Amino acid sequence: MLSKNLETAINKQINAEFWSAYLYLSMSTYASNRGLPGVANWFEVQFKEEMDHAIKFMNYMISKGNKVNLFPIDAVPTTWDSVLNLFEENLKHEQVVTSLIYDLFALARSEKDFATESLVQWFVNEQVEEEENALNNIDALKLIGDNGFGLYSLDKELAARVYVPIATTNSGSNA
């Protein structure tokens, strides 16, 4: 069983993951409403990944005999100034999530909970990828501009992104 401190922290992280999913669904809808199905697809994949993250944490809590508390999800933004701003906000959000994950890792380490530390290490690695993806999209938009043919081309590229489910149980590897 996890300590009360870790139980509370992981329950907060579960809420943050669901909020992230809701944010990305909102971003996907924003892109769809602007005729950008590729950008919408990219954020829909993000939405699904965040749902997986929440469920991975939930299943871990259950496997440890702890109680999962599903808190209300606060409202998310629904409008952005531009596609570039959309991805800039995506990066800012991922940086916040990285900070939350680091705090959770530090707590697990301070409590010498090596199993939780191992689980959270997977999320540390995931956040490196999440921030890199956001930065790559921002760099592309700054290079090509977020309108016209450049945006059309990027939208086509982002349409090719495919959702690959992660293992949401914690037996075996954390992949």
Regions found by a protein language model. Name each.
Residues M1-A175:
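Iron-associated oxidoreductase/ferritin-like identity signal
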